[in-house]
Amino acid sequence: MPKYYCEYCDIYLTHSSPVGRRQHNQGRKHISAKIEYFQNLLREEGITPQNFLGFLGSQAYNNILSNPMMNNFMHGNYNGYMKYNPMRNYHHSNRNPNYQHSVGMHNNKYSRAGYVPPGANKYPNNNFHNNKRISNTPKPYNNYTNKPITNSPYKNDKQDYRNNNENSNNFSNYQMNKDNSNFVNKNSEQPN
């Protein structure tokens, strides 16, 4: 098996396994050699920190920000282990289209935890955490008497109050009427 050559350090690795390569790539000599390589490359191109963004142009900068993986690097979330453990510092983007990302809000007085700007609702409506019923279907039991809720005071006691579907109520009424009629017919027959 051929030995692994590192072009930044200009050496052949004695351990060319993936573990040996990883250890070499995380070493301080390799990192400093890589930094020096790219600094020399930028120096040869005539790129200085003052004209760096002008050299990239607005299109290149916008393309970097449109890539969600590059956003991790731009926000200072770069991790040296990203290549080998990509989910370690990955922050999921908010999928809410009305969400406004607060870039540079750390110096703003509105960014303090618990601070509510003037005129804002201190207790916003939240359907998940409040106790209001969202659906219009009635509760199966009354809160005060703990008895089943009825739509009419003349309903049969055998009706299933848990199912408020009109079709099933009609069917259950039909079944009860049928059972009651059979019961009456059986009792009306008297032996001679």
Curated annotation (Swiss-Prot):
Keywords assigned: Metal-binding, Nucleus, Ribonucleoprotein, RNA-binding, Zinc, Zinc-finger
Signal peptide region: none
Gene3D superfamilies documented for this protein: Classic Zinc Finger
Subcellular compartments: Nucleus
UniProt-annotated stretches for the region Disordered: 118-192
GO molecular function, one term: pre-mRNA 5'-splice site binding
GO BP: any one term: spliceosomal snRNP assembly
Zinc finger (Matrin-type) stretch: 4-36
Any single Pfam family the record assigns to this protein: zf-U1
Composition bias, Polar residues: 133-154, 174-192
Gene Ontology cellular-component annotations: commitment complex; U1 snRNP; U2-type prespliceosome
Biased composition (Low complexity): 164-173
Function: Component of the spliceosomal U1 snRNP, which is essential for recognition of the pre-mRNA 5' splice-site and the subsequent assembly of the spliceosome. U1-C is directly involved in initial 5' splice-site recognition for both constitutive and regulated alternative splicing. The interaction with the 5' splice-site seems to precede base-pairing between the pre-mRNA and the U1 snRNA. Stimulates commitment or early (E) complex formation by stabilizing the base pairing of the 5' end of the U1 snRNA and the 5' splice-site region.
PANTHER family: U1 SMALL NUCLEAR RIBONUCLEOPROTEIN C (PTHR31148:SF1)
Family the entry assigns: Belongs to the U1 small nuclear ribonucleoprotein C family.
Oligomeric form and interacting partners: U1 snRNP is composed of the 7 core Sm proteins B/B', D1, D2, D3, E, F and G that assemble in a heptameric protein ring on the Sm site of the small nuclear RNA to form the core snRNP, and at least 3 U1 snRNP-specific proteins U1-70K, U1-A and U1-C. U1-C interacts with U1 snRNA and the 5' splice-site region of the pre-mRNA.
Protein name: U1 small nuclear ribonucleoprotein C
